[in-house]
A protein has these predicted regions:
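Short, low-complexity disordered leader/linker segments with a strong preference
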Residues: 1-39, 62, 123, 421-424, ...
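Extracytoplasmic "Venus flytrap"/periplasmic binding protein-like
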Residues: 59, 63-136, 172-174, 276-277, ...
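Hinge/lid segment of periplasmic solute-binding proteins
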Residues: 102-160, 188, 217, 297-299, ...
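Extracytoplasmic/periplasmic solute-binding protein
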Residues: 143-156, 161, 171, 185-234, ...
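C-terminal capping/gating helix-and-loop segments adjacent to ligand/active sites or protein-protein/ligand interfaces
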Residues: 146, 375-429
Length: 434
């Protein structure tokens, strides 16, 4: 599955493979007859694609006088959005189009009253009945499918974790900026050398309200986030491999070479030239390149020696929650627009996310040229063969399970418990919930 998924996404981003795709520009077909207002919920802050969201919404509204899209930013990433969404659904005030994080896919399918897109399209927009086949390949659609194969949304944003670094700090520390760390052993060594030679902090790994990059380091060391025992999903991270990976991060913090802080603090330290390396999503590329006081450079997510690199596909997919027929029709027009090659090229350029559909790499607005000229994008694309699915805790307690593992991160990185202790205790708690 991993190789097929990687091949698909490489193909979707490669101009050499696709020369075009089915059109999604029939926004007027099956259009809305009266003025309809819909809400679009997202997690794009001002420094993480928020400006691009506003531009896309404004462009859509200008082209569709009978539809008014109101965008709403939800803080605390996908956990915060999902919690807000639950409250909205409970009060009967559903948003219409929602960016749902991949790690909440199973939870959303089992616990949120979403609108099934495929039968809705068949009924209200039959001219788009082949949208899925024309726009995406089967394995790409599978990203937004539950474990039992139910399609609950449409792929939108694809990201991978990468290692951004400051070449000026590398040079000052006696490191070669053209030969960045390839393994975690080299990351630890580089972080120590940066601190000793320059006084700057060496390393920071993002601390969003999720476990995305932590999954990458755990599974790249041979561990697992989840396991299936007798048909039941359980926590899989109570292993020596997972503990060793997490302890490596904690030891860097303990030794004074790694940073345990909020994202705002960590990212600002990097952008202001006071941090050598930051491990985070390629989705931060555009903001970093615009805001940094130095040339931003990226390297692939580090490996463990002799072990296979595994990076979870980050980002989000689009779900529909409209119940009113007019809102459903309007929401579908908006989804088609933001999934169009032109809009996706703007979204990818304004963020760093990789496009999930055919044709975007050949977009006349220049994303093809950007891929060819931007080495940081090329770095992200190079890790596509190592993609795995972002682990998603199932069941009604999935959100609570996710939060327990987030809490364990703080316990481990603050040195309150060893990684082995914290992961063992957390696994027991999660298994009692699932």
């Amino acid at each position: 599955m991993k190789k097929k998924l990687a091949a698909l996404l490489l193909a979707a981003a490669s101009a050499m493979v696709f020369t075009g795709c089915g059109s999604s520009d029939n926004q007027s077909k099956g259009g809305v007859d009266k003025k309809v207002q819909i809400e679009y919920w997202h997690v794009a802050s001002e420094s993480f694609g928020g400006t691009t969201v506003k531009e896309l919404v404004a462009d859509f509204n200008a082209k569709h006088p009978n539809i008014q899209v109101v965008e709403k930013y939800n803080p605390d990433m996908y956990k915060g959005l999902t919690q807000n969404l639950q409250a909205a659904i409970a009060s009967g005030k559903n948003p219409d189009v929602v960016q749902m994080g991949w790690s909440y896919l199973n939870y959303a399918a089992e616990n949120l009253k979403y609108t099934d897109l495929q039968p809705m399209i068949k009924k209200m927009a039959p001219e788009d009945k082949n949208f899925w086949k024309e726009i995406y390949l089967p394995n790409c659609l599978a990203l937004a499918q539950t474990d039992d194969g139910k399609q609950i949304g449409i792929p939108y944003s694809i990201s991978v974790p990468v290692l951004f670094y400051n070449p000026e700090i590398f040079t000052a520390a006696g490191l070669d900026p053209n030969n960045p760390p390839k393994t975690w052993k080299e990351v630890v060594s580089a972080a120590k050398q940066i601190k000793e030679k320059t006084g700057n902090m060496g390393f920071f790994m993002q601390e969003y309200a999720d476990n995305w990059t932590q999954q990458a380091i755990i599974e790249s060391n041979g561990g697992s986030m989840l396991k299936n025992e007798g048909g039941k999903v359980k926590a899989g991270f109570d292993t020596p491999e997972a503990a060793a990976a997490y302890q490596l991060l904690a030891d860097m913090v303990k030794d004074g070479n790694g940073l345990h802080a909020t994202n705002e603090e960590g990212f600002q330290a990097y952008l202001s030239g006071k941090l050598g390396m930051v491990c985070t999503t390629i989705g931060k590329r555009a903001n970093f390149e615009k805001s940094a006081k130095f040339k931003v450079m990226a390297a692939p997510f580090p490996q463990f020696e002799g072990k296979e690199l595994k990076v979870p596909a980050g980002g989000n997919f689009l779900m529909l929650f409209s119940k009113d027929a007019d809102k459903q029709k309007a929401a579908w027009e908006f989804i088609k627009y933001i999934e169009s090659p032109e809009a996706l090229a703007k979204w990818s350029t304004g963020t760093g996310y990789l496009p999930p559909r055919k044709g975007v790499a050949d977009d006349p607005n220049g994303f093809k040229k950007m891929i060819e000229e931007n080495k940081n994008i090329q770095v992200a694309l190079s890790t596509m063969p190592n993609l795995v699915k972002w682990a998603s805790f199932p069941g009604a307690n999935g959100l609570q399970a996710e939060q327990l593992l987030i809490d364990a991160r703080d316990i481990i990185l603050s040195g309150k418990e060893t990684a082995a202790q914290a992961l063992h205790e957390t696994a027991e708690k999660i298994n009692n919930l699932l």
